[in-house]
Design a protein with these regions (language model features):
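Non-catalytic linker/capping segments at the edges of enzyme domains
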Residues: 1-57, 152-238, 327
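A beta-strand-loop signature enriched in Asp, Gly, Thr, and Trp
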Residues: 237, 241, 266-268
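Aromatic/pi-system hotspot detector in well-structured domains
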Residues: 71, 91, 134, 185, ...
Length: 331
């Protein structure tokens, strides 16, 4: 029987705070990658689909990369650390510092910033939580993303105690203010796109989306350089898990159907995976507009909360799988 391959990634007990992983392949955002990403998720974000509109609004040539494609690639590049992941528990503090265009090349550095061993449970292999900080830059060194996530990783066979007991509750909780879309022309958007447009009266509204089947899950993971084994090999946990960004991507696609004039995603305040998703599930979301913040030049920022539910292909009760708070620009 072949021996386990260490290329899969480190065990929890092999990590130390301060460790850096920066050897993932850089990835150029191509039209082909954008097309496949859109085909899998069906997102209708206008600025990522319409180059004439995008150039008029951003004032620069070229088509912006879809923000979901950017985050998927950044997360995928960080899976050098989490090839053995059992579950990804949360994302925190994801902020766009700049918006790449198609043709830009992304690289991501991942740092271990906290480690906490889980309590050992009888009959279960020991695990621990690794808090990671990802910073993504483009080919010019411009900062694109800065965010944290928490992954549950197994411990190596025979390891009982690592001594890691960091408090992970505040990691990634600091608020960061950026304005990468500050120079965009909202009037140009409104002149070219029919309403409804941003209005302060949107605050407090709630919407139930239509549903989407989860399909092409391994393809999305491969596209985004995500090498976590649980997304590719059912033997890891008895059933292949869908990459969490796939669920997030479908939730964003549903948000763009509910609010078709969203311009872009500005950041994620929090994102908690509350249950597993499997290929063939059907997912839908309840979208809450929790707060609106008008901008001086028109338009505004929506603070949104998406609660996502899944229904198995075989039926059964609906189950909540995602609680995602994010901010979006609307003109």
């Amino acid at each position: 029987m072949p021996t386990p391959n260490s290329v899969v990634g480190p065990y929890f007990d092999e990590l130390v705070v301060g460790q850096v992983f920066d050897s993932a392949p850089r990835m150029t955002l191509t039209e082909g990658a954008a097309a496949l990403h859109q085909a899998i998720l069906g997102d209708r974000l206008r600025l990522a689909l319409d180059v004439e509109l995008a150039e008029a609004v951003t004032g620069t040539p070229g088509l912006p990369a879809h923000p979901g494609l950017v985050t998927d690639v950044a997360i995928g590049q960080s899976t050098l650390v989490t090839g053995r992941v059992k579950a990804n528990l949360f994302y925190r503090g994801l902020v766009f510092h700049s918006y790449p265009k198609l043709g830009d090349t992304l690289s991501t550095t991942t740092r271990v910033v906290g480690l906490r061993q889980n309590a050992v449970r009888e009959g279960r292999a020991p695990t621990g939580l690794a808090a990671l900080r990802m910073t993504t830059t483009d080919q010019h060194g411009r900062l694109v993303l800065d965010f944290h996530r928490c992954a549950m990783l197994p411990m190596a066979p025979g390891v009982v105690d690592t001594g890691h007991h960091d408090d992970l509750t505040t990691i990634g909780a600091d608020e960061v203010s950026t304005d990468p879309a500050g120079s965009w022309d909202g009037a140009a958007f409104r002149a070219r796109v029919p309403g409804p447009h941003f209005a302060s009266e949107l605050a407090g509204h709630r919407y139930r989306s239509s549903a989407d089947v989860v399909s092409s899950a391994p393809e999305l993971a491969r596209l985004s350089l995500n090498i976590a084994a649980t997304h590719h090999d059912w033997r890891v946990g008895g059933r292949r898990l869908v990459y969490g960004g796939h669920t997030i991507g479908l939730a964003l696609a549903q948000a763009t159907r509910v609010l078709p004039n969203l311009a872009t995603v500005m950041g994620w305040q929090s994102c908690d995976h509350t249950g597993p998703v499997y290929e063939g599930d059907t997912v839908y979301s309840d979208l809450h507009i929790e707060r609106v913040s008008p901008l001086p030049a028109g338009g505004g920022v929506l603070d949104l909360r998406s609660l996502v539910f899944a229904v198995g292909a075989e039926g059964g009760d609906d189950r909540q799988v995602l609680d995602w708070r994010f901010s979006a620009l609307m003109f």
